[in-house]
Regions:
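Short pre-active-site segment immediately N-terminal to redox-active cysteine/selenocysteine motifs
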Residues: 66-68, 72-76, 141
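Active-site acidic short loop of glycosyltransferases
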Residues: 64-66, 96, 121-122, 139
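Structural microenvironment flanking redox-active thiols in thiol-disulfide oxidoreductases
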Residues: 81-119, 129-136
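Thiol/disulfide oxidoreductase modules built on the thioredoxin-like
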Residues: 114-122, 128-175
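N-terminal targeting signals for export/organelle localization
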Residues: 1-50, 156, 167-177
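A short beta-strand-turn-helix
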Residues: 38-41, 46-68
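Hydrophobic beta-strand core positions in alpha/beta domains
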Residues: 69-71, 102, 146-147
Length: 177
């Protein structure tokens, strides 16, 4: 292999290797990893974390009676940034019927409040220090969202996020109301 080809191959690998860690493949139907798919039909794992910026600790039980989206995300994840305005729009479209909790898996909470401000969302963001909540849910990539029905049962899992996924989420929410 020539030196030029070797460098080109190394650059290609360096650029493409991180992609599965942030983005995944949702494809409209909500692809899910094997570990996460075990959650479908089971009660959403409970947790109790304080929102970044203050307030009382929250978790799935805090939103009983509402359709809940538990979204695992990170500040370094570009598809996460795209998904947040969609979640905010869904909250506004279904007032009082839907809730969203963003669970950050970042190593430190430093950029979470800034991320929330930049994306313009008003739903609570919590920091999963030590990633114990992520360990219970087992998200396969960032972002991964778990759609939980009004009884607290995980009904759907979405890995990754692409423009256009809002329609699938809206349809799922309507079916659970």
């Amino acid at each position: 292999m020539s030196r030029t080809r070797g460098v080109a191959l190394a650059l290609t690998v360096a650029v493409l290797a991180p992609l599965p860690a942030c983005g995944g493949a949702m494809g409209g139907g909500g692809a899910k990893s094997g570990a996460a798919s075990d959650q479908i039909g089971a009660p959403a794992p409970d947790f109790s974390l304080a929102p970044v910026g203050g307030g009382s600790a929250i978790g799935p039980r805090s939103f009983a009676g509402k359709v809940l989206i538990v979204d695992f995300w990170a500040t370094w994840c570009a598809p996460c940034r795209q998904s947040f305005p969609v979640y905010q729009h869904l909250l506004e479209k279904f007032p009082g019927q839907v809730a969203v909790v963003g669970v950050s898996v970042d190593d430190a909470p430093d950029g979470i409040a800034k991320f929330q401000s930049e994306t313009g969302v008003h739903f609570p963001l919590v920091w999963d220090q030590g990633q114990s909540v992520a360990g219970a849910y087992k998200p396969g990539t960032m972002p991964t969202s778990f759609v939980v029905d009004r009884s607290g049962i995980v009904q759907k899992i979405h890995e990754g996020f692409h423009q256009g996924d809002e329609a699938a989420l809206e349809q799922e929410i309507r079916s659970l109301l």
